[in-house]
Amino acid sequence: MRRLGRASAVDRLETVEERLIECAAAAREELGLPGLSLRSARLCRDKPAMKQALREARIPCAESAAVASLGALREFALRQGFPLILKPIAGLGSQQTFRVESMAELDRAAQALGVHRGEAAAVEEFVEGHEGFYDTISIAGEPRLEFISHYYPSVLEALSNRAIAPQIAATNRVGMESYRELRELGRKVIRTLGIETSATHMEWFFGPKGLKISEIGARPPGERIWDLYCVGNDLDLYGAWASAVLRGRVEAVPSRRLATGSVQVRPEGDGRVSGYEHLGEVLERIRPWVFAKEIPAVGRATVAIEKGYLANAWFRLRHTDYDELCELMNWIGRTLKVRVR
């Protein structure tokens, strides 16, 4: 990076890749560039450190700890009780994330993450409730564009059963009173972690213990979620991000005209697609609302369900009414069947 800085003018440095967040921040500090600080980048990557900072700011989040031995892990389990979540310190999405219900399951998950040989992992309280996310483009620590989406069902539940047709739904009701607490808490998280001008992606839970923050990333969300926001709000979010980073302002105004969503229909098993049931019926009914889709050809190899929401067959829909959008996605999941051989 020093050679690059000497060879040519570098004005900004950004990344959408979670694993490069700290590297990019270190490079910015080395080159004297504006952007997310190395301290904030580390807090966004190190989940236990992030949650400790949030707890110190009295922001509700799961009890958690960094552990690097089976003894420390079991001590946390005895103190906190089950179920627990065990995952990498700086993981990506739900990759290598385990929900464990007993000491035996905890030991197996610890083996998978290398805790038994001294590798660090994050262990935390399992938070019961509905799961969603709050995304922003923020400037000087204040969200200038904000969006709210929901998972149906939770990410870990969707991974537990391939018969589930998992959905992501981006609401056009962001300004409603029912979301006020989430918006205020999201803004407090951004300020607490020192996130200045950046895209952010914050996951949350709402359940018997109220609203709790899961984690936040200083980057756009994955799964091409921004495409949902662009369609639903009649704006170019990618251009707005560039304007925020380069000019320190955002002129785009979200219309909130449409709710948008993505539903994935998984094959009945691994193998090769042999055909579809009710595909014609589905395509006919959703024609007015579908704006993107992927229907793998007969004979194509299936993709592991762990690969995310845009694997195998999927559909992206838009509708003026959020509830109607969700019902359409539910109907697709109930109706379409993907057969394999």
Task: Tell me what each language-model feature is.
Residues 43-122, 127-128, 139-141, 170-184, ...:
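Active-site nucleotide/adenylate-binding loops and adjacent lid/helix of ATP-dependent enzymes
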Residues 64, 86, 123, 145-148, ...:
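Generic preference for hydrophobic
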Residues 34, 90-93, 222:
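A short, flexible beta-alpha/helix-coil linker loop
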